[in-house]
Every structure is written in C-alpha cells, then in structure tokens.
Amino acid sequence: MSTQYSILFKQEHAHEDAIWTAAWGRSEKDGSETIVTGSLDDLVKVWKWSDEKLELQWTLEGHQLGVVSVNISQNGAIAASSSLDAHIRLWDLETGKQIKSMDAGPVDAWTVAFSPDSKYIATGSHLGKVNIFGVESGKKEHSLDTRGKFILSIAYSPDGKYLASGAIDGIINIFDIATGKLLHTLEGHAMPIRSLTFSPDSQLLVTASDDGYIKIYDVQHANLAGTLSGHGSWVLSVAFSPDDTHFVSSSSDKSIKVWDTSSRSCVNTFFDHQDQVWSVKYNPTGSKIVSAGDDRAIHIYDCPM
C-alpha cells in the first residue's frame, strides 16, 4: 500500500503514434488486470498488468483509421474499440480475436461505453444522436436524440439509470435510459466536452472541457455543484475512483491532477508526460491510475489508499 502519489511504471513508445484512449479492466474469471490502449496508428493493444509492470499481450489489427475510444466490459472479458473508420469492433481479451465489427456510420463513432450490465454499447455520433448497439446482436437497437451537435463523450451511470452525453458545443444532456427521455440539458461549458464521468454512487457527474474547467453536477437536480480550475489548457479526460473519494483529470497542459471529491481540491499533480494527455483511468481497486497521450507513452501511477 502506497502512502503517497508516485509514478510506478512508464511504457515508452507503446504505439507508433499518439495514444488517444486507454481502459483498465479486471477479469472476473481469474482476477488478472488488463489495460487496453487505442492509437492513431490504427492499432488496439492489450497489455497485462502484473508484478508492477506492463506486458504486451495482443496487438489487435482491423481498424482502417485511428482508434479514438476503447472500453472494457464489466466482467473484463470483452473490449470495444471505435475508430475514425466509423466501425466499432468487439474483441475477446482472452484470445485476442475479433468477435464482431459493427458499422456505426455514416461518418464516425467517437466515444464507446459499455452499459453497466455490458449488454449494450453506446456511442456518440456527429449528428447529435447516441446510438446504442446490442453486444450480442451487433445491431443498433436504440437511439437517443439530443437534437444537438457532434457528441464527443458519453457515460453511463453505474446504477444503469442515466446516460450522459457531451457535445462539441459544450452542451451536456442526461437521458433516462428506461424511457429514453431527455431529463436535463446542462449548459455550463461553452467549448467541447471531451470527457464525462459519473461518481460510483451515480449522484454526481463530472465534466471536462476545452474551456479548461472541470464542472461537477448534482445529477438528480441538474445543479452545478462545483467548478474547478487548475489546468492551463483543455481538459481532455476525467475518471472517478471506485470508492467515490477522488477523481482524476488529464489535460493538454501535459499534466494529470487528482482531486478530492468532498473538498473539491487538487491533492496531487503529475507532470511526467511530454505532451498532451488524452486519457486517464483508475484501476478497479482505485490504487493505481493509467494515463496515455500524444507522447506515445503509457504511465502507471500509485495512489495512496
């Protein structure tokens, strides 16, 4: 158990080009931990995390253009990736084989997110729609219409009740998943929403924007509960720790910040990347953070528990 924040491991030259996305999952089967990364080099890579180091397990080929988003199912068995080639691909993490490819066209799928029960994958489109695909069927099963602009980011609430989307014009929409109804439209940002994340108890929504701010919303009442500044540029990624106590952000200012949820204060800043940091996530226990970005490196940090 670590008592302070520190960098634990660096994987330099992890990809041939910028890394835009990373996910950290744990297999329900054997407890093994996997990190999946996606890059502008068109590749998805699967890394095993054990003995405090990363080992490349699979290099997954299939996308024709850069990979913009990856996500891992709740049971740690499947990864989803989306690419500028407008396809979503599902991969078996045990064998490294492609399970299926879904055409998310006509132009693009940006963020991909598994539903909490891992039966569905949601993705945002340039037309302001959230398209929801069945993992089993591989077909589009529902669509939620924001009547807005290109959706860059989406997140499911862990309790399965809500889906939030963030658009290129800074507008955030929260939907009731059961009814498909639009519940709230949040207009706190004026620039693209790169990332959003619900707290583990589904009470808070944290948003990251090119305006340099992180905002915290009370989901039920759609109230703005906090505005955090500290990054010197675009905020590209936000993620909650599994125990609700902290969340982490990354920015094009090359830094990663860890925030205390209750005090809304920054408790640690990492300046280890050489370029903008596109993706940051906690591991399933909240003891580690993974980050990746334009410098093609994957970093693992230790968090005090």
UniProtKB/Swiss-Prot annotation:
Top-rank taxon: Eukaryota
SUPFAM superfamilies linked: WD40 repeat-like
Annotated InterPro entries: G-protein_beta_WD-40_rep, SKI8, WD40/YVTN_repeat-like_dom_sf, WD40_repeat_CS, WD40_repeat_dom_sf, WD40_rpt
Swiss-Prot/TrEMBL GO biological process terms: nuclear-transcribed mRNA catabolic process, 3'-5' exonucleolytic nonsense-mediated decay; rescue of stalled ribosome; transcription elongation by RNA polymerase II
Chief location of this protein within or outside the cell: nucleus
Presence of the UniProt keyword Repeat in the record: yes
Keywords associated with the record: Cytoplasm, Nucleus, Repeat, WD repeat
UniProt keyword annotation of Cytoplasm present: yes
A GO cellular component annotation in the UniProt record: cytoplasm
Paired cysteines (S-S): none
Compartment(s) of residence: Nucleus; Cytoplasm
Extent of the WD repeats: 14-57, 62-101, 104-143, 146-187, 188-227, 230-269, 272-305
One Pfam assignment: WD40
Family: Belongs to the SKI8 family.
PANTHER family xref list: SUPERKILLER COMPLEX PROTEIN 8, WD REPEAT-CONTAINING PROTEIN 61
Quaternary structure annotation from Swiss-Prot or TrEMBL: Component of the PAF1 complex. Component of the SKI complex.
Its biological purpose: Component of the PAF1 complex (PAF1C) which has multiple functions during transcription by RNA polymerase II and is implicated in regulation of development and maintenance of embryonic stem cell pluripotency. PAF1C associates with RNA polymerase II through interaction with POLR2A CTD non-phosphorylated and 'Ser-2'- and 'Ser-5'-phosphorylated forms and is involved in transcriptional elongation, acting both independently and synergistically with TCEA1 and in cooperation with the DSIF complex and HTATSF1.
Protein name: Superkiller complex protein 8
The organism of origin for this protein: Danio rerio (Zebrafish)
